[in-house]
Amino acid sequence: MQRHLLLGLAGLPALLSAQRVSVTCSFATVAANGETCDSMAATWGLDTATFQSLNPKAKCPEVIGGEQYCVVGTVTTVTGEPTTAPATTSTQTTTTTTTEVTSTTVPGNGITTPVPVQPNLVSNCNKFYFVNKGDNCADITARYNLDLSDFLEWNPKAGNSCSGLWANAYACVSVIGYVPKPKPKPTSTSTKPPTATGNGIPTPLPTQPGMTDGCNKFYLVKPGETCADIASRNGVSLSDFLQWNPHAGNACSGLWANAYACLGMVAFSLKSRFRVDCTGDAHNVVNIAGDQGQCINTDCSVGSLEIAAAGVCPDGEVQISYWEQPGCQGKWFGYGYAKRGECRGLWTNGWKFKAMHLRCAKSQDDCVNKGSCAYDPEPAQGVC
């Protein structure tokens, strides 16, 4: 009887435990050609075993370029009795083990690093920001008062155009030893009356810190506005705006609300002086904008031009066109040239002309040098 029972039991299927593994992937990425399980795991702050558990069908150590692989997810292991258990078994015992890949510790620095992170994130990062869809590098750097150059150094995959920044992954916003910059605030939010600067241009106050000299167009920055908003709305390039308002910084984190920003520069500024060495009375104080220039009358009282260094003339070159009569009329006596930031004595010490047309221009581009025009001969006597 005992033997019969043993034989009957021996004929039953083996009651071996069965395991099922289920992966719920929260974030997957495409493998590049040449990558391996090890390299992808390292990029995303995982060990290879965890990477394999998230990708049970992967044939490590190789991965297939162009295929998607899970790098953030939940691994669930179910252990239970086989479905071929005897009919007398009425209860199935199930054990569920869940492994959720949420963070890892970067070896060597002891900092708990959330995953997923931006590809090639620096290893000494100690502060992280989860990039949401629609975020860009400028938004993030402005939020944390960072220089764009620092952010791109810590998150190199983003690239200079920020096109490589991944949404739904953590970016680095500080590293070990980095000292955050204090965010500057304007000392006053009231608008002061304009003041005349050394170039004679009425300038409203307060202005952005470090605003360039020679500005002739201003904009009162409202709370919440960004450099890109202001530049786009006013038809200037962002690079020019940042050059004229350097304290704003590449991330625009240094832009002050309730203070005036520069939106345009004079081409050049000058004072016409009585003597040929830029001394004596100033007859004209002129700020010339744009590329069309301006005619000024000398009234026989100008022997030199004191030209300011500030301005946007290409290569700093200012063209002086000499005319016989006021209003740049009558005979034309040709061109002279000067540089911004110099004293320029005038042709015939100012005695044989009564007007000058001044503009930005390069000598090699004028009609005389190109042979397409001719000027009138110098008069034998002065016209003054």
UniProtKB/Swiss-Prot annotation:
Gene deletion effect: Does not affect virulence to host insects.
Sequence ranges of Low complexity compositional bias: 81-106, 186-195
GO molecular function: chitin binding
A Pfam family this chain is assigned to: LysM
Sorted UniProt keywords: Chitin-binding, Repeat, Signal, Virulence
Domain of life of the source: Eukaryota
Induction text: Expressed during in vivo infection of insect hosts.
Span of the signal peptide: 1-18
Ranges where the record places region Disordered: 81-112, 183-206
Entry-linked InterPro entries: LysM1-like, LysM_dom, LysM_dom_sf
Domain LysM, chain residue ranges per copy: 27-71, 127-173, 217-263
Note: In plants, chitin acts as a microbe-associated molecular pattern (MAMP) that is recognized by lysin motif (LysM)-containing plant cell surface-localized pattern recognition receptors (PRRs) that activate a plethora of downstream immune responses.
Domain comment in the entry: The LysM (lysin motif) domains are small globular domains involved in binding chitin in eukaryotes. Blys7 contains 3 LysM domains.
Function: Might have a role in sequestration of chitin oligosaccharides (breakdown products of fungal cell walls that are released during invasion and act as triggers of host immunity) to dampen host defense.
Family: Belongs to the secreted LysM effector family.
Name this polypeptide is given: Secreted LysM effector Blys7
Organism: Beauveria bassiana (strain ARSEF 2860) (White muscardine disease fungus)
Organism lineage string: Eukaryota, Fungi, Dikarya, Ascomycota, Pezizomycotina
Gene: Blys7
